[in-house]
Amino acid sequence: MVINFEELHPNERVELERNIFFSTLEQLKGWARSNSLWPMTFGLACCAIEMMGVGSSHYDLDRFGSFFRTSPRQSDVMIVSGTVTKKMAPIVRRLYDQMPEPKWVIAMGSCATAGGPYVNSYAVVKGVDQIVPVDVYIPGCPPNPAALIYGINKLKEKIRYEAKTGKQVTNK
């Protein structure tokens, strides 16, 4: 069906312009992906308690379209919260590799972002970004659930921006 805009009444033209939008397939996929993130929780220390609070009725992460998954094969976001030891590093990498593409990582808390108070220990990895690429860093010891929700919203913005521009946003 072809619509000739010149033949329409001005009010009809305005109404039609309000109800039609143009987009690319990549932008549509980015919008859909950003509004249906399925995070996999990987809690290693006290930050995990705050991460669990996001799933409670007070914060209700479900209202943002995000549902916690227990399997990496069903997840597209890995939230690493807590101290990552060198013994745990291969497991983090294996879980990341099992996630389907596209996949994103959120480092939650001082320990996950830079080693935290245990940074000088021989057994602690100095940031999960040495094992897997991190998309969003959430500082704090421990960060509160509102900070995690803010970080998830920042990840959504990043996904939409990358879909719109076609440019990969990196933290390095």
UniProtKB/Swiss-Prot annotation:
Say which domain of life the source belongs to. Bacteria
Q: Name one GO molecular function term.
A: quinone binding
Task: Write down the chemical reaction(s) this protein catalyses.
Answer: a quinone + NADH + 5 H(+)(in) = a quinol + NAD(+) + 4 H(+)(out)
Q: Where does [4Fe-4S] cluster bind?
A: C46, C47, C111, C141
Q: Which Pfam families match?
A: Oxidored_q6
SUPFAM superfamilies, per the entry? HydA/Nqo6-like
**KW Cell membrane (keyword) present:** yes
Q: Which InterPro entries match?
A: NADH_UbQ_OxRdtase-like_20kDa, NADH_UQ_OxRdtase_20Kd_su
Q: Which family does it belong to?
A: Belongs to the complex I 20 kDa subunit family.
Q: What is this protein called?
A: NADH-quinone oxidoreductase subunit B
- Gene name, per UniProt, is nuoB
